[in-house]
Amino acid sequence: MRARRALILTFFLALPEAAFCQGSDPRAAFAAAYAHYTSGRPVEAKELFRSTLNGDFRLADYSVYYLAVIAFNEGNWDQSRQRLNQLKQRFPQSLWFQSATLLQAKNELAEKKYDRAGEILRQLRVEKTIRRDIADEALYLQAQARDGQGEPRRAYALYDELRDNSPNSRWTANARKAQARLREKHPELFPFQTLQSLAEEADRLARERQTGEAEILYKKLLNNAADAETRLRFLSKLSTLYLSARNRNEAMPLLEQIARDYPQSAEAPRALYQIGQILWNRHDNAQALDYFKSVIEKYPASAFVDRSQYAAADIHEYFGRKDEAAQAYANVVKQFPKSAVRDEAQWRLAWLYYRAGEMPAATATFKALAQQSKNGQFGTAALYWQARSAEKAGETETVKPVYRQISSGGAESYYEALALRALERLGESIDEPPPFRPAAAEGDPAVTAEIDFHLTRARELAVLSLHPLAVAELDEINAKTKPTGRLRALLMREYFRNHAYGRSLSVANQTPLSQSERDLYRYPLAFWELIQQKSLERDLDPYLILALIRQESLFDQRARSPAAALGLMQLIPPTAARVARQLGIAPPSQDKLFEADVNLTLGTQYLKDLLLRYGNNWQKALAAYNAGEAAVDRWEREITTDDIEEFVERIPYVETRGYVKLVLRNHRIYKRLYDQKR
């Protein structure tokens, strides 16, 4: 779709500007103007934007705003003010209204009219419907105005407020730089030497993920700590900083010092547990077990006992000590009914019985978990394995109703397909429904003037393939009206039309639709032509690619994970570079990985490589896509079973186990919805 937009803009850029004289199509003029504007050619854009202001062009407020920005950037502040006043008077409902207010303040700041700028920004910030990005920039500009008014302390405090409220805002880095300039300019006002001021700044830097700068301050605070309590405080903060940055080698000695020197503190059990976790992740299981036992024995009332019991059980299981593992898992289940690891412990306990061939105990434990977690993570999973355990015990007739219950529970469950296979194995079969054919969409409902204002603009922008702007208009409708009924269905379709699949999915979940019709919005054929092309090149199932992308990025080309995975198939740059070299092409930049063609080329090749590595075993290939080949290679050694269903259930990483199931579920639904050959 980005390619289509680029073609459209290239087409309009190629036309002679005489084609957009007065009386010409304002839509074409706007498209060409926008192409110039976003390509850094404001002079060429100006006249074209002006030509769209004659008549009732639906995007006139956009043209007025862009003209105001161009005038501001040219230093023509009076003309910029005129355009902004025009926008706010003619289009009070415009998406650009708050941005226009910001630009008004910038005009005043540019002319050093700090009092006027401050008043504009103060009024903007008290608006109830102010957008988060606008609020952050307004606070930053208000701090600048205070500085200009000769109030550096107040400016500094406003920068602190911005950093405290929005540590991940794009304005936060600017605020840090501005504060550094203020400290340099006014050293007498900002000595920056008190314990409290240094600690607050270190905490802010840590929240902003400025690990290196935070480390320097925490070390300074630690070295200058006047008493044991203060020293413990900063040992804890510094160790937490290292752990959040995955710098475990630096964290270890600090955690050991906390556990050794402050055994009576509340931080001691945390330190012991985290040391155990580090060792556990390094597969130094014997030493890790000692630390978990220390938590259990020395700090039985701490908040880390349940997790330490669970970790100890896992290690006992790794060493083949079934009885010790079962006892530890059972302790978690009985002693910590509200623990986050309680259900996982009962799941692992049931599997201990299953693997040992103790089917009555396995059946009872799975059954108890199914009842306990009826609507939770393990509900259907435990119910299915309750039936499998009973079937292995010879109860073939009593399990059929359970399999039927699972198979009729809707395609949202990974276990529906497993239950259908089980019924076929037991001599029964259930016909799957034919592919769904949607009914014609209803016409638009009657809408208010405010909704119509944004809806007409969204549709105009969609025609020009300016989908992010169209989605922003639809977001205004969603935020201002809390739509219901037919309006919600309309919004769902418009989001879908503009490739905002996450938003259309969210609205579809709240819209009264049949399951099959809802699934069309929840499981879109996004990027279908490109995916079909890549699937043919790699000999891959196109529905598997769709299923994986839906789980990885929900078809958001600009998706970026906390682990720096990028684009549709969430590739990390080292993997992308490795696959690119394999294909004989240049390693892509991060920006290139946001392009659908590049991302799909590399991502589908990586998926193909994994399938080849694991003998076309989808479950293992998907597990490796999520957790890495090294992890799956280790699990192949540790999980001794030929039953692939069992292999999936015994994947130690909860996230990876769920990921494999969800991708396979997605694939099944895609096949049901769209595959004419099934």
At which residue positions do the language-model features occur?
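Acidic, polar-rich low-complexity tracts and alpha-helical solenoid repeat scaffolds
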Residues: M1-R2, F12, A19-M569, P573, ...
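Sec-dependent N-terminal signal peptides
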Residues: A6-A14
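Short loop-to-helix capping motifs
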Residues: N616-N617
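Short, flexible loop segments at boundaries between secondary-structure elements
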Residues: T656
